Design a protein with these regions (language model features):
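Active-site-proximal segments of metal-dependent phosphoesterases and phosphodiesterases across multiple
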Residues: 283-324, 344-345, 360
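Extended active-site neighborhood of metal-dependent phosphoesterases/phosphodiesterases
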Residues: 109, 118-136, 190-284, 311-312, ...
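Alpha/beta-hydrolase fold active-site loops
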Residues: 144-145, 176, 247, 254-255, ...
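Short, solvent-exposed loop/turn segments at secondary-structure boundaries
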Residues: 159-160, 189-192, 270, 300-304
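Active-site-proximal loop/helix segment associated with metal-binding centers of metalloenzymes
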Residues: 100-101, 282-284, 288-298, 351-357, ...
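Active-site neighborhood of phospho(di)ester-bond hydrolases with catalytic His/Asp-centered motifs
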Residues: 149-151, 177-183, 208-215, 260-261, ...
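An acidic-aromatic substrate-binding cleft motif
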Residues: 128-181, 186
Length: 452
């Protein structure tokens, strides 16, 4: 009997090893393979200038840039337009060597900015400067602000995102800032950072960018690590990290805005949850907005992203988060929480992307609306008691329109998109049985919507 038990035990171990080996072989590239970086040489001129938020409240701004491996002294020069006074501030530099090359990451902080004022600035490395850029600070008001939200960008080299983003910029010149839900670059490589910057260069120097880490910004391995360039580009992370988690929050106008890092291995999410609860509990703002890369409720499979859901979703509901902005799954989807009467309430969960790649979609009954095979952008306007989220296709057609109204009588969600047809086109990447399955499920969803 003892021999039999041992054989059974060894058989189970062998089976686990075989199954594990098969899974590792199938998923090897996804989990462990990092594409070699193309060789590059950075010039000594300051380049890839990004304006971001800082770490000292809504009036704080940082600027980051890169240059070659010879320059050392980083400085920020700026002036309040019309004042005639120019300030020169010492910046910080970090020499970074990657598999493709090397150079300096630089960053600096603006000081004593004022509500409503406009500033011109340029950055220096030794005796080389960038062009002059300018930006305007928000007015001293808690009644109104707006921003643009973009899901994954993740474009190829010489891609189409630049035209897409230029169009968004011209449509919403008064947007206070831009939020990106990760996968800002296709890969953590210099050539893709160049591509990402060129896609947003006219925005990046004039509006604060607020970016969550995505899985494409990570280096794969047994323990995934955020590629070191990311935190020096979005330098607010250098001071906001919590127990090695790349998290950040800012109180802006009458909102607390939070970004999480959903790419971390599950054991890191415990400390993120701890930080998130402290941040939400401390917030006295009317609106609470959270951004993370992976959808809390996946639209690729009901069991996807379970650790993210278990760690964060209960806190979103307990502390009254209004809007959850997500990416990763390369389709459009909008979900609202439901109260005991089945009425829509917060949080409002939004999944979106602006990448040329569209993935398969698993229709989840928890969601209210889907969209496939298009690129999307969202404009969020907060005025008084109302937060309005409008989603658009790449051709500027209105695709979704939802209002969250918060007043003394409670929170109400108004769906203004009921008469806008859903677009459930076949993603170009699907074929064969997967394509047939998509069509069947899409038809079921359409019929479900008709019944509702």
């Amino acid at each position: 009997m003892k021999i039999t038990k041992k054989k059974i035990a060894w058989g189970i171990v062998l089976l686990i090893l075989i199954v594990g080996g098969v899974i590792c072989k199938i998923r090897w590239k996804v989990w462990f393979h990092n594409i070699p970086e193309i060789r590059y040489v950075l010039t000594e001129d300051p380049q890839r200038v990004f304006l971001t938020f800082g770490n000292d409240g809504e009036l704080s701004r940082n600027v980051s840039w890169v240059c070659g491996g010879v320059s050392k002294q980083a400085k920020l020069e700026y002036t309040k337009i019309g004042s005639g006074d120019t300030l020169l501030v010492d910046g910080s530099s970090k020499f970074l060597r990657t598999l493709g090359g090397f150079g300096y990451a630089n960053w600096a902080k603006f000081k004593e900015l004022s509500y409503g004022d406009s500033y011109s600035y340029r950055v220096w490395n030794d005796d080389r400067s960038s062009d002059w850029y300018s930006f305007t600070m928000q007015p001293d008001s808690t009644d109104h602000f707006s921003f643009v939200f973009i899901g994954d960008v993740q474009d190829t080299l010489r891609g189409k995102t630049r035209g897409f983003m230029e169009n968004v910029r011209h449509r919403y010149p008064q947007a206070d800032f831009y939020m990106f839900a990760g996968d800002f670059a296709e890969r953590p490589m210099n050539c893709y950072w160049d591509e990402a910057y060129q896609s947003v260069d006219s925005i990046a120097t004039t509006k604060p960018l607020f970016v969550s880490p995505g899985n494409h910004e990570y280096v794969k391995g047994l323990v995934r690590v955020l590629e070191k360039r990311f935190a020096y580009v979005f330098s607010y992370l250098l001071e906001s990290r919590y127990k090695n988690n790349n998290v950040y929050s800012i109180d802006y106008n009458d909102a607390t805005i939070i970004t999480l890092d959903s790419n971390r291995d599950p054991w890191f999410l415990f400390s993120q949850r701890e930080w998130l609860e402290k941040t939400l509990k401390a917030s006295k703002k009317k609106w609470k907005i959270v951004m993370l890369h992976h959808p809390v409720y996946s639209i690729k499979g009901k069991t996807n992203n379970l650790a993210v859901r278990w760690m964060f979703d209960g806190l979103f509901r307990e502390y009254g988060v209004d809007l959850v902005l997500q990416g990763h799954e390369h389709n459009y989807a909008r979900m609202t929480n439901k109260n005991d009467e089945g009425e829509m309430t917060t949080p409002l969960y939004l999944v979106s992307h602006a990448s040329p790649k569209s993935y398969r979609l698993s229709f989840n009954d928890k969601y209210d609306r889907f969209g496939t095979n298009h690129r999307f952008y969202q404009h969020i306007d907060v005025t008084g008691d109302t937060l309005r989220m409008q989603a658009y296709l790449e051709n500027d057609s209105l695709y979704d329109d939802v209002r969250i109204v918060k007043n003394a009588s409670g929170t109400q969600i108004i769906d203004n998109a009921k008469d806008i047809p859903e677009i459930l086109e076949m993603p170009a990447r699907l074929s064969g049985k997967k394509a047939e399955e998509f069509e069947r499920n899409a038809e079921k969803w359409r019929n479900r919507s008709l019944v509702k």
